């Protein structure tokens, strides 16, 4: 197929070793996997050199922005185009832009104990409605019960996060959404109380007034609104993790011309280049620093005498999706939410089994034989034992529950 594009990423849980894996994004074949105790440059270089020896030099490399990883790539493959994942890039930009104010907002909301108060009030309302919850006609016919039902619905709405996209922070700012719902709910309760004078509305007004009166919360939320708007502009320029998109962590970005995206990002940079805000200037500095690693022209390769164009992926989502798939399997097998012990005990080469679902890989592996049994029978047992001992040397003693 003219070569391979190397995607690199790692996964761990707690203080487990990092399962560091390389995959060809064109074929989807996992090329290699090792365990390392950190993502320092000197730990990653042997992994990359091994891939270079086995598979040659890749057409391009896609990874996250880890300093050690980028340094190792530069040392082993200095002439290869090294690209960073747009999702990781945006996530880092967003955290730098929003994190401090977002933490302040979250802490002030926590200290206000508004969530506890609202949940307690919701429980009171539910008990008041009791069995009548199933008979809406009886509730709506009683003004006080109807007001209780409405107030309860407003509380549930304040806590609702279904409008979020599923990307996590900084793409989803659930605490800022909650704050705005509280303020909106407060205004709605005041209007309803003025119209009806019903007690449940007044009870919510008393709870929510502390949030509306908190000027520091209002100031912090205002700063977040401003910077979230700027962050969303950059998301739109890069055409990935767009607000309102429901793909969540499976979002690999829209199929767009790279030059068009680069031009829009350039316009974004020029728009905020003159800002006096230190957060904005740091954001612009980051974009300029990684500019060459963000936008790649299609790569021309020759296959069967014909020139074809290969466009590297904009994200390393295929690696992220694989790791989520692996952790789901480990949770299902071990029966534990945490996969730390299973990752620690697992031989790094285990992930290569996933390749057996790839028809192209299976054809290469079988090499004309009728099946895996016949193919494995051709392998010298001494070679197998040598390779197996190498893999075992990377592992601690497996815990009992990991042997299931």
Regions found by a protein language model. Give the residues of each.
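Inter-helix linker motif
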Residues: 77-101, 105-106
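Amphipathic alpha-helical/coiled-coil segments positioned at domain termini
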Residues: 82, 303-388
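Charge-dense, extended regions
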Residues: 237, 241-271, 275, 283-286, ...
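Amphipathic alpha-helical
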Residues: 255-337
């Amino acid at each position: 197929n003219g070569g391979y594009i190397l995607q690199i990423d790692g996964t761990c849980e707690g203080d487990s070793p990092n399962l560091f894996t390389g995959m060809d994004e064109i074929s989807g074949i996992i090329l290699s996997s090792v365990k390392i105790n950190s993502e320092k440059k000197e730990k990653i270089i042997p992994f990359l050199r091994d891939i270079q020896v086995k598979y040659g030099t890749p057409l391009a490399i896609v990874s996250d922005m880890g300093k050690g990883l980028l340094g190792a790539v530069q040392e082993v493959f200095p002439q290869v185009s090294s690209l960073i994942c747009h999702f990781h890039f945006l996530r880092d930009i967003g955290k730098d832009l929003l994190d401090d104010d977002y933490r302040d907002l979250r802490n002030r909301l926590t200290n206000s104990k508004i969530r506890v108060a609202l949940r307690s009030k919701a429980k009171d309302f539910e008990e008041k409605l009791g069995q009548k919850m199933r008979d809406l006609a009886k509730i709506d016919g009683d003004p006080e019960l109807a007001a209780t039902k409405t107030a309860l619905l407003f509380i549930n709405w304040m806590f609702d996060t279904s409008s979020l996209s599923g990307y996590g922070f900084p793409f989803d700012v659930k605490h800022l959404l909650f704050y705005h719902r509280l303020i909106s709910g407060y205004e709605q309760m005041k209007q309803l109380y003025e119209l009806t004078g019903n007690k449940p509305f007044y009870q919510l007004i008393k709870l929510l007034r502390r949030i509306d009166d908190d000027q520091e919360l209002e100031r912090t939320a205002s700063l977040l609104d401003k910077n979230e708007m700027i962050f969303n502009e950059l998301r739109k320029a890069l055409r990935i993790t767009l607000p309102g998109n429901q793909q969540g962590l499976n979002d690999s970005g829209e199929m767009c011309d790279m030059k068009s995206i680069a031009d829009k990002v350039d316009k974004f940079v020029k728009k905020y280049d003159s800002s006096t805000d230190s957060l904005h200037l740091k954001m612009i500095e980051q974009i300029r620093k990684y500019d060459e690693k963000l936008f790649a022209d299609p790569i021309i390769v020759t296959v069967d005498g014909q020139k074809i164009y290969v466009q590297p992926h904009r994200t390393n989502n295929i690696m992220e999706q694989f790791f989520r798939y692996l952790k789901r399997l480990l949770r299902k097998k071990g029966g534990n939410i945490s996969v730390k012990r299973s990752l620690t005990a697992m031989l790094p080469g285990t992930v290569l089994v996933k390749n057996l679902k790839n028809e192209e890989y299976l054809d290469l592996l079988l090499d004309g034989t009728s099946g895996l049994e016949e193919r494995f029978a051709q392998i010298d047992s001494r070679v197998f034992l040598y390779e197996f001992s190498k893999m075992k040397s990377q592992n601690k003693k497996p815990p009992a529950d990991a042997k299931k």
